[in-house]
């Protein structure tokens, strides 16, 4: 663990209702550890915020003492170590209030999508969740939020109506299209560069049920399934959402039989319309190659986790992504050369995927935001598990090879939530267009001129 350096007096933090812990104290590890165990956090002090007042107190102390600040709810996006400074843990702030009349939800900073689903489902409503309901709502949305049903409804940031946010000067602000509009712009897609969100209000959708799941073939059929899927994506309605993946699943109890320990090619689909129509639409995928496991069925929207079967337990992971301008045959060939059967069963990436973009994801938000993935036709992402240093190095090498090989087909940009470990300023800027990045840097200089919020995917004040 990194030794703490000299810290300013902590007396002001005694006003915080939640715990305040330092390295060496019994509760420290639980307070700072996130879902992604690849990043070891060693802040000099961590607070467990119980509400907006705690965050205001913490930010005023940080501003007065020039202490850098990091924020974590679930830690799914923890692709960087938090060293020194102050960590604000919002995981205790899980309140969700659903207004069925306005079809909106007010969601506190630490709430997971599972909390939102549970509160919204009795009203026949749902939010634009990503591939795991275990992820935090706020961090996901600040990065734009790429939903499972994105082609049908757009980015999660598009549905946000307002934020309550504490800016680095310690002021609690309300931000919407009419009040603090520039702050509202930067918070939707600009990640946590201009403040610490205490809650947001977002629209919900009347989505009680959907038709979805995965069509799994043995990996020897990956080429046939990929080419069929790619051609099929040019024919389907905007509401059909899908992703092709190559999966090397470990033989662990958390993975259900018969998928456990297998090497698979999979197309995951999600269709919010009539199940009979969805069944007809995916027929070409079921006919493309011998299907070993088919989990596609009508389900409650709250059961969305069954579609992509993301891990539910913390693990050390390396994730990365790339926006693709298209997916021509040579791009498919390159992808499979890197991750398919030819790469070997011992290839270290757990999953490498190609997601169909377009549809509502390509349409501008009704209110301008900082999301910069609307021009991508496809989206590539990968995850490697790193339980030990030799495996970690193999994962890093495989990741570099994959993204170098696929670079000719990319737009040159990433998505901030799945960007992976942020590098230098040039690398960080790849999550946005040059124009949006410059605007974010300007906003950073207005709201956070001292760069207190400097951890993770942080831009530089102009």
At which residue positions do the language-model features occur?
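Soluble FAD-dependent oxygen oxidases
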Residues: 1-462
């Amino acid at each position: 663990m990194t030794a703490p350096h000299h810290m300013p007096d902590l007396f002001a933090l005694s006003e915080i209702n939640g715990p305040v812990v330092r390295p060496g104290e019994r509760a420290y590890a639980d307070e700072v550890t996130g879902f992604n165990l690849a990043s070891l956090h060693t802040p000099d002090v961590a607070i467990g915020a119980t509400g907006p007042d705690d965050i205001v107190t913490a930010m005023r102390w940080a501003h007065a003492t020039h202490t850098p600040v990091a924020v974590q709810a679930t830690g799914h996006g923890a692709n960087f170590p938090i060293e020194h400074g102050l960590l604000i843990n919002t995981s205790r702030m899980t309140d969700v209030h659903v207004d069925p009349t306005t079809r909106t939800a007010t969601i506190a900073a630490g709430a997971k999508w599972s909390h939102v689903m549970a509160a919204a489902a009795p009203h026949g409503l749902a939010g634009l969740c990503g591939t795991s309901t275990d992820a935090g709502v706020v961090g996901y949305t600040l990065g734009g939020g790429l939903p499972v049903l994105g082609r049908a409804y757009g980015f999660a940031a598009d549905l946000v109506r307002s934020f309550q946010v504490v800016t680095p000067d310690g002021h609690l602000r309300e931000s919407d299209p009419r009040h603090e509009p520039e702050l509202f712009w930067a918070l939707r897609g600009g990640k946590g560069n201009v403040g610490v969100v205490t809650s947001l209000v977002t629209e919900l959708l009347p989505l009680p049920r959907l038709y979805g799941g995965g069509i799994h073939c043995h990996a020897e059929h990956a080429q046939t399934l990929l080419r069929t899927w790619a051609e099929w994506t040019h024919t389907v309605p905007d509401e059909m959402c899908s992703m092709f993946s190559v999966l090397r699943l470990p033989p662990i109890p958390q993975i259900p039989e018969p998928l456990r320990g297998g090497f698979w090619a999979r197309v995951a689909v999600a269709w919010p319309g009539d199940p009979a129509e969805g069944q007809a639409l995916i027929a070409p995928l079921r006919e493309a190659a011998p299907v070993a496991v088919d989990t596609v069925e009508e389900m409650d929207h709250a059961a969305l986790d069954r579609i992509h079967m993301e891990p539910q337990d913390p693990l050390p992971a390396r994730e990365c992504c790339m926006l693709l301008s298209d997916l021509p045959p040579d791009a498919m060939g390159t992808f499979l050369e890197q991750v398919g059967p030819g790469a070997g069963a011992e290839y270290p990436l757990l999953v490498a995927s190609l997601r169909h973009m377009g549809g509502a994801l390509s349409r501008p938000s009704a209110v301008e935001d900082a999301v910069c993935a609307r021009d991508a036709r496809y989206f590539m992402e990968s995850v490697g598990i790193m339980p030990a240093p030799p495996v970690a190095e193999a994962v890093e090498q495989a990741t570099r090879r994959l993204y170098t090989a696929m670079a000719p087909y990319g737009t040159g940009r990433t998505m901030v939530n799945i960007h992976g470990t942020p590098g230098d300023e040039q690398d960080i800027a790849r999550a946005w267009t040059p124009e949006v990045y410059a605007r974010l840097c300007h906003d950073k200089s207005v709201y956070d001129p001292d760069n207190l919020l400097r951890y993770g995917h942080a831009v530089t004040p102009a």
